[in-house]
Amino acid sequence: MHNLPINSYREHEFAAVAAHSVYLNHAGVGPAPTRVVQAVSDAVALTSRDPIGAFISLVMPAMASARARLARLMGVPAEHLAITKNTGHGLSLVADALKLDAGDNIVSVDCEYPSVVYPWYAQADRGIETRLVTPKLDGTFTADDLDAVMDSRTRVVTLSWVQFGTGFRCDLASIAAAAHARNAIFIADVIQGLGALPLNAQELGIDIAVTGVHKWLLAPPGTGGLYVAPHILDRLRLVNMGAGAVVDVMKFDPLDFTVKPTVQRYEEGSPNVLGLVGLEAALSLLEEVGIDAISRQVLALSGYAAEKLDAKGYEVRSPRADYQRAGLVTFRHRSLPNASVLKTLEEANVVGAVRGGNLRFSPHFYNTTEEIDRAVDALPG
């Protein structure tokens, strides 16, 4: 980790986006830092000159380094982390692979992002029921709320670490414990916190963790991560098999279907090389800054935004308690529709979003309080 001031990273890595707009939508898509642009550009140039050589020289180093960095950020062993295409890909793999019987059920919440629940809806033809808990009026929920709908046939509890529409950060450890008390697997989508907040998935008792990389991780879309704890692996069927599933990926004659002994058996074939190169570069930046420093800045900025929105007369919908909040600040005007307010922001060159019936700001570590001031000042009174 380097001790450069935050504004140095802003100047050297985020000058393009900072000059273009007040960008407060990292919960949607993060901007590519300068080093990511350069790394991907160099890789493209190499593939145009020497395709096979580029593939050989780029794939293994980029995958190994990106995997190791992503594993450190997630708090899991690298050997138990597979590289996927995105969050939905990882969750779909797990839903299709998990050994279930007709009458089993899955528990989640009804404010979830579609990728978290749709893979389980698709298991209805196997006789699998999806049970959704409605959060409290403030958008929060607890392990007890989830446990109230669990029973002896509950096999999975699955939800997001941070809710995309409210910004609520759930208590992963207590929910994992509640799931395990029912002999259920706990699956967490960590995309809305990873890169903004510290995480130790293994220590928290998460059995399966999934993520994409195009939000707070500031990497190109099209790559993701899937962690499966080793004691869970034998509960997953072999699905999505390809050449990358086996121990000796270069053994063609005769074929040898000896699958890898970890979740990496689900890495079907040729990976997203340019995405991995970009991911490795993006993660190198986050490691330089340090996740603790990033988290302090993100939480300080989101807290500052909530205070400014209060002062402007807006209804802040995201949680205020430190243990429940993250980098997302959700809010509403007292009378104007969200679409109208968002249009006003766009006209002022402020990039936010509307999700879950709320307006949303999601600043990252390189943003400034001055940018928050500009964004709130641009809001209609």
Say what each PLM segment does:
Residues 1-381:
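Pyridoxal 5′-phosphate
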